[in-house]
């Protein structure tokens, strides 16, 4: 099994994916253990002094003015975890919780939180045992970190609350720890607070969304190319010299991908209908510009994610010179903004794909294809309602594109009077990515059927590879009306599992 070693300098997106989705083991480096011990020494020294230190000898949030005596400090740390584990709603996905826990461990190991080495080791042990705390959908405002979600994780460290075992059964966390031979943690000064105060949930979901969107944007280039073929469009608009004079990197990559898929096609380069078009419709001609803008948005989001992965997000933080200082680094605005940017890009990519699908189904705009790609139009409805489903998905995506980060609701008696709503932005982006997959699947279904109805014209070799693979996957070709939902589900799985991309790349080589 793959092992990820956590040091003091952060982790990579690949590390997060390996742990969250691949179940990789986690180990602490010697450097991290030393940094943990050094920072803990600073916290212990400050805890022994009479001066108030936030999170060590004071209350939290609006209660920070309350001095906490020595004998109550362990209870203070337990209490913050218990009281902040106030999430509601359905459980979030296992991969999200594993990313959340791993990224909190990453920050703990930075040496800036004051958490003891044994607490960090217990976090790693829980991940390695396949124990997943029950975390709920609602409870984070994306400022002071993802407080409620991280509190549910910290509760498991204490042997309290509920968690899912490696067999998928939800049980008391204490029982699962005992079976795994893991001792619950007895929290000390600052540790409860340090386990809760980070942007780890929204960051983990951003990293996973970027991984999914990398595949989906390439898949969307493929389906756009297939639609262009089915509509007898021209590939001249994809010429590299046209995109070089507007040098947005994503646009050039998207155009290159489409051109690679279309190489060798007999359906492109000229118009086959009786009334030749001077230009194709925007949804066909401008596909690289729209997809490319989304790719460039992803590039910015990756940069934000990389910076956040290299960050130590906590409040207060332990500095090498011995100070423990309050700060505002827990504010999720940088992550929240790019999550919202991506939701807008996803909605627009889906919108242009739906417009191409609708064009394929309209006999007045499809340049010779039958109405709704039906076998016997009138008796058969063809893909009419598949486009309705696609339109419903796009409408939902437009609602999901409304920024969460533009909103803020004050909390904690107005002490925390501006928040990022980054967790909400991340949750809606996950739904958006899921729906984009379905939208691309419907375009794939329509475009492949349209190409097969162009008898006597040979599609591109890459298109042929996709056609062969999608038919083997159980997506039926042209013919009389039938129960469509199974075909659409098969197309969805074909896109979601990366088989569309893999089929095209058997001919094109790796797409950009």
Ranges and model annotations:
Residues 1-19, 23-50, 70, 77-135:
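Glycine-rich, flexible loop motifs
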């Amino acid at each position: 099994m793959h092992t990820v070693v956590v040091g003091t300098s952060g982790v990579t997106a690949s590390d997060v994916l390996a742990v969250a989705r691949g179940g990789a083991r986690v180990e602490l480096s010697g450097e991290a253990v030393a940094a943990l011990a050094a920072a803990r020494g600073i916290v212990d020294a400050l805890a022994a002094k009479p001066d108030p230190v936030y999170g060590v000898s004071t209350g939290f949030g609006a209660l920070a003015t309350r001095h906490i005596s020595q004998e109550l400090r362990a209870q203070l740390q337990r209490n913050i975890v218990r009281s902040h584990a106030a999430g509601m709603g359905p459980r979030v996905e296992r991969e999200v919780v594993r990313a959340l826990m791993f990224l909190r461990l990453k920050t703990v190991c930075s040496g800036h939180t004051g958490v003891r080495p044994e607490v960090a080791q217990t976090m790693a042990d829980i991940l390695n045992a396949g124990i997943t705390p029950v975390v709920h959908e609602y409870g984070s405002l994306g400022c002071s970190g993802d407080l409620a979600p991280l509190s549910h994780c910290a509760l498991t460290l204490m042997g309290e609350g509920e968690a899912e075992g490696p067999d998928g059964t939800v049980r008391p966390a204490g029982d699962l720890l005992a079976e795994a031979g893991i001792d619950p943690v007895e929290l000390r000064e600052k540790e409860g607070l340090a386990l809760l105060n980070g942007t780890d949930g929204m960051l983990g979901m951003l990293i996973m969304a970027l991984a999914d969107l990398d595949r989906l944007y390439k898949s969307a280039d493929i389906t756009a190319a297939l639609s262009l073929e089915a509509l007898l469009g021209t590939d001249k608009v994809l010429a590299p010299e046209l995109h070089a004079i507007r040098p947005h990197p994503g646009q050039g990559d998207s155009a290159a991908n489409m051109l690679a898929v279309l190489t060798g096609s007999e359906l492109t380069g000229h118009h086959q209908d009786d009334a030749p078009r001077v230009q194709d419709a925007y949804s066909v001609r401008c596909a690289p510009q729209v997809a490319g803008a989304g790719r460039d948005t992803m590039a910015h989001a990756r940069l934000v994610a990389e910076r956040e992965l290299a960050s130590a997000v906590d409040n207060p933080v332990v500095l090498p010179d011995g100070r423990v200082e309050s700060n505002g680094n827990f504010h999720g605005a940088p992550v929240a903004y790019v999550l919202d940017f991506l939701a807008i890009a996803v909605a627009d990519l889906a919108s242009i794909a739906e417009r191409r699908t609708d064009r394929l189904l309209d006999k007045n705009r499809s340049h010779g294809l039958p109405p709704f790609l039906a076998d016997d139009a009138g008796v058969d409805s063809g893909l009419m309602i598949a486009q309705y489903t696609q339109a419903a998905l796009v409408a939902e995506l437009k609602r999901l594109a409304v920024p969460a980060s533009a909103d803020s609701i004050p909390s904690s008696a107005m002490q925390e009077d501006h928040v990022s709503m980054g967790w909400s932005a991340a949750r809606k982006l996950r739904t958006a990515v899921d729906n984009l997959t379905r939208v691309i699947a419907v375009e794939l279904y329509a475009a492949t059927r349209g190409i097969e109805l162009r008898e006597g014209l040979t599609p591109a070799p890459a298109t042929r590879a996709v056609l062969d693979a999608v038919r083997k996957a159980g997506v039926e070709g042209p013919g009389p009306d039938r129960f469509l939902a199974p075909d659409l589900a098969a197309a969805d799985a074909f896109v979601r599992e990366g088989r569309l991309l893999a089929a095209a790349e058997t001919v094109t080589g790796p797409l950009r």
